């Protein structure tokens, strides 16, 4: 795994990366892994053989199947990394809490706290410790989650969180600058796309067409206005950068194979690479046969 030799140079290296222009990935990971079945799985119960039909795997950074046999089978492995929030069960939570840069608890996810991306210590931790940790474990690259949060916080309280959106973009650029050869997938964070779409290989549209309603505890189609809005944002990104692979993660009940087929058909017609899962992401849901 190729990395920049300057990784250990500390904040000076990071600041230089933040001020630099985009560093496009050295390898076309989208071409290598895109257009093929892929999966998101945040557990460790499934045997290696269960992943046989998939090329790209997004796995939890700590709870996951053995990585070496998956890599030996040619799988592209992305490790989950929440960079807009810190969960209380993560090993680095106590350190970040001591720094005083944790904000409110996410009302939808108990024990997960928004983090102030404007603090250079957070960027340093992600780039110099967390990403290398994933690569040492055997992941090829990273799946960046919760980058919607800094955008949301700045929109909701522009004075208090001024600069959070740009800080999120700078974090993505810093990862790419320090790791030019690894695959990077970003989850949603659509307003960041014009700033970072040349620094990532995959953009994930989560809950674009189908979602889970936690109040009714049921799966449902996304309202048409929201679906069309997301569709436009993703297609616009594809037009600006054709090399960018757009993946979709929709949620539906495995007890309704016809519904799952409908989602796959819809997203492929959109030009995206779909996967349909249960909301817990703790089991592999194979695409139903035609």
What are these regions (language model features)?
Residues 21-25:
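Sec/Tat signal peptide C-region and signal peptidase I cleavage site
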């Amino acid at each position: 795994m190729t990395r920049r030799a300057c990784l250990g140079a500390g904040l000076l290296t990071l600041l230089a990366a933040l001020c630099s222009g985009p560093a496009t990935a050295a390898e076309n990971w989208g071409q290598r892994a895109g257009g093929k079945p892929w999966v998101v799985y945040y557990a460790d119960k499934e045997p290696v053989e269960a992943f046989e039909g998939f090329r790209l795997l997004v796995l939890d950074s700590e709870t996951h199947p053995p990585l070496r046999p998956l890599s030996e089978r040619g799988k592209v492995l992305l490790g989950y990394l929440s960079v807009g929030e810190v969960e209380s069960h993560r090993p680095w939570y106590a350190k970040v809490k001591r720094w005083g840069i944790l904000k409110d608890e996410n009302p939808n996810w108990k024990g997960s706290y928004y983090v102030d991306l404007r603090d250079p210590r957070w960027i340093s931790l992600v780039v110099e410790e967390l990403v290398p940790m994933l690569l040492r474990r055997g992941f090829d690259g990273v799946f960046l989650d919760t980058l919607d949060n800094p955008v949301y916080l700045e929109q909701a309280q522009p004075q208090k969180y001024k600069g959070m959106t740009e800080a999120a973009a700078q974090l993505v650029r810093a990862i790419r600058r320090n790791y030019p050869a690894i695959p990077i997938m970003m989850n949603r964070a659509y307003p960041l796309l014009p700033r970072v779409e040349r620094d990532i290989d995959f953009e994930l549209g989560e809950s674009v067409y189908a979602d889970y309603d936690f109040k009714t505890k049921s799966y449902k189609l996304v309202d048409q206005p929201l679906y069309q809005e997301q569709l436009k944002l993703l297609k616009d990104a594809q037009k600006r950068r054709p090399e960018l692979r757009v993946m979709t993660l929709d949620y539906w009940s495995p007890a309704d194979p016809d519904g799952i087929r409908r989602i796959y058909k819809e997203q492929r017609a959109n030009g995206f690479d779909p996967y349909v899962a249960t909301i817990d992401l703790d089991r592999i849901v194979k695409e139903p046969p035609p």
